[in-house]
């Protein structure tokens, strides 16, 4: 199962990944921050979780520091974490759609 979202939808995806790490093959986070309140499970439960974090370097609503925090947390937990920073604001574009597509195909083809 793969889940993901943009902005607030991605915050929900973060929350689900933190609560149920072994339920998902992959999580796609686009332009989001970690939930305000969250807890983590035993780190070994995250080792098979794949996470793609995408953030716009020109996002005026959510600074890239939020993306870096999410990246650092999931790396610390041992998840397979990929980060991509696009030269966009708080939006999606063909570049980010393409990145998501490539990431998903690479995992499905394993």
Predicted segments with their positions:
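Alpha/beta-hydrolase-fold catalytic nucleophile elbow
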Residues: 4, 28-31, 54, 86
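Flexible "cap/lid" loop of the alpha/beta hydrolase fold
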Residues: 32-51
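Short beta-strand/loop motif that positions the catalytic acidic residue
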Residues: 52-55, 59
